Amino acid sequence: MVDTLGLPTVFFTHSAADLQWPELARLICPDDPDSSTSRSKALMENPAIADWFFYHRIHKFIDIFYKGVLGASDYWMRFEWQHRGSPHVHGLAWLEDAPNVETIFSATSDREANTPNATHDPSGSEDSTLHAAKQQLIEYINRTVSTINPAVLPDGSNVADAPLPKTNPHICTKPYSEVVDYHHDLADLIATCQRHTRCSAAYCLRTHNGVQKCRFGYPKPLQPQTAVLMGDNLNSDEDKEPVIITARNDGLLNSFNPVQLSAWRANVDMQYCVSRHKVIKYVAKYATKSEPRSLPLREVYTKPEG
């Protein structure tokens, strides 16, 4: 797939707000769609309908957002289900107008190999071309992927005063058609769906050398502006592949596209792809990953008769 289509542009994740989405509530409990108790009960009794709804929603979203807004020429995705049955999807999208990352990095590597003592001064003609290409890439990334919290100052100094999650009523119960103030709505969605605020040993905390750390790397260091780091500029000897670090003013914020989040109205993720090796490794992992059997079903089959 990667050999045929080339390096995909973005990696994406979409989760379900199946207890909040009003469209699903009207489908599975039309008599009382505003009751959280009725929604929860109907969801447990109609898991197949909820799964169909998610499947239909993401395919429509692919057509309207990824193909229509971002100009995707192709995509790949893989569905997963949590133990309680709530689905999410991981995927890749190839965007037609995206800068060719591999060409830029290859040209930079060739330049450094041929001129090991180069200072990378953009005043030279060849360096100027590479500098312009990298700048074009950075501008495209800034339009496509964000780790900026609009409710926080650029330097992140007031992040402690960021809005709290909006859960009563939950922000995801409001359909996009009823949004009056886009920026205020986006800030509420970010606060509720995109901030990694609940680290726990059961979920993400791992102990290494006696120190507990989040396996997702939160809180992440702040970044004043988006940067493209080549292999030789990285501290790790294990990974010399290029890395893109997006501008960040909130160390707990998961990456997203503002239009993606506003329209989907549940937790999302979007990251820019820079490594063919990592993409192939990722696809192989998720394409061959099996779903764990549910504990109740296993108990039913193993329970002695009588």
Please tell me what each predicted stretch does.
Residues 1-89, 93-306:
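Intrinsic low-complexity, intrinsically disordered terminal tails and linker regions enriched
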